[in-house]
């Protein structure tokens, strides 16, 4: 069974073709709008939607030409339906529905977060058995789930304010750095010369629950930098290190608690922040020291992409899900 996946929830236009029977990604294409939005310091929804309109058909033509496949080979078209920018979601959903009607192909709505959660399966070496704990950590979400089977997601904890990735981006903005901020902060943190110069709080780290809070950490960065008389690049790097160290410390601590609480031994990490080198290193240490198995997405699939939507759509389709080609129902916000 072969599925075409379409991702358009924010500022990445992604198409991919996934073969469920072989559990193999056949092809994927991605167009990033980062350069377009960089001068605005963040994503402009109207521009994002227009770029999706301009690029979707071009990417579709390219992916079919490169694979030698045609729409006759496609069994299902999966598209991101929620959550995301409504205009951007509408573009992708309309494109999917139109193709479905023209070529008489079933369509299936995919939850963006489910796509991320399953993205480690895109690594051919990943053989993830249920149940497991999943940390979904991105610019819009920071959530811990217990996953007992496909489609059975029990929320264990989440951020009560800023998501971790959002805190990275806002910290970058506070320090006058570029967009996307998370990458800028992580890169500058690598240049720290005095890693103990700044000590920042670890919000909710010692709380018994599995919720997160990052707004206080962001405020601590603001106050620390405001009070710093020597706002040199060197000290900015030291502060980036302190921020990243605190944020990652909280994430790792909560993962450890979640594994203990649920008595699971498998941990799956996904979302844009899963590409962070320090997070991967610290979680690898946790797994090694306590005998856990840990799974990350391939680096290229940490951020939004069509491959994760094609794969999640394939899993949903074989489990009996599909929707009417005449209905379009997208949502800006929707829990998994």
From Swiss-Prot:
UniProt: Fe cation binding residues: 112, 116, 304
Cofactor dependency: Fe(2+)
Cofactor binding description: Binds 1 Fe(2+) ion per subunit.
Gene3D superfamilies on file: 3.30.420.40
Keywords: Acyltransferase, Cytoplasm, Iron, Metal-binding, Transferase, tRNA processing
GO process terms (BP): tRNA threonylcarbamoyladenosine modification
Residues making up the signal peptide according to the UniProt record: none
Catalytic activity from the UniProt record: L-threonylcarbamoyladenylate + adenosine(37) in tRNA = N(6)-L-threonylcarbamoyladenosine(37) in tRNA + AMP + H(+)
Binding positions (substrate): 136-140, 169, 182, 276
Protein family according to the UniProt entry: Belongs to the KAE1 / TsaD family.
Functional description taken from the UniProt entry: Required for the formation of a threonylcarbamoyl group on adenosine at position 37 (t(6)A37) in tRNAs that read codons beginning with adenine. Is involved in the transfer of the threonylcarbamoyl moiety of threonylcarbamoyl-AMP (TC-AMP) to the N6 group of A37, together with TsaE and TsaB. TsaD likely plays a direct catalytic role in this reaction.
Protein name: tRNA N6-adenosine threonylcarbamoyltransferase
Organism of provenance: Francisella tularensis subsp. novicida (strain U112)
